[in-house]
């Protein structure tokens, strides 16, 4: 079956707009039953500073971070942040740290028996990485929080509302480490993200060669097939790829400019230090000269 590559921001956005798929995706990764999912993509508009009338200027997909508020089977509300990061980039890491900090400061609207309320929710982060982490040899990793008694080092089977809101669990998917295994529900879901069997060099369209084990897997495959075969959607995906190329080029220019500015600042700092040293030497020479003049005047007066 021909499908669109779900690592594409637009494709992932399309999938997550389907409530059944979003719930299946989150339940599978988080390994818990979810009663409700309210997911909203956080779009960061992209504008080409050279030509605002261009097609890429109208494309609002350059960074698609997804925020979901969920209600678990035990009635607990949580906030899930989903980040697609295709390349290892320091700017992206710092951007998401700031983005995470902003969400820690926010209160979220939830529906309760008492009506709508605004509360600070526990946060869960999901990172879909397009690169490998060194020494982390697994396609899917859970970084969990534990309550450990530091006196006797025993794990405590408890929960504190305050602690839950000050710490968070993380789920990391390393897309390049996904292999052709379908033994578990998680492996079946991740098989759509496997970066093999592309039909051309663009990396946008691929063949999905595996059996579809259940209705939700078939639903995902059908949505990806539609995106991968509809001519208008294919053109939209190609546009996104071009916009991403422009974005990366401009990002490279920004990083280069930052590096050049750092070098220039270091040179200025060195020049200032050298000038300071020169001024100090001149001040010392001047003071020495003044001291000699003063001594000469004293000697002259003494001789008279």
Where are these regions (language model features)?
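Residues that form generic nucleotide/phosphate-binding pockets
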Residues: 14-15, 28-29, 99, 188-196, ...
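Selected N-terminal structured segments and early membrane-anchoring regions
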Residues: 114-115, 176, 224
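Extended serine/threonine-enriched, polar tracts that run as long, contiguous segments within proteins
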Residues: 152-199
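Short, charged alpha-helical interaction segments and adjacent helix-coil junctions
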Residues: 2-3, 69, 73, 80-85, ...
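Accessory alpha/beta interaction modules
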Residues: 1-169
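Short hinge/gating elements
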Residues: 6-13, 175-176, 205-210
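Short conserved micro-motifs at the rims of enzyme active sites and ligand-binding pockets
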Residues: 137-139, 182-187, 236
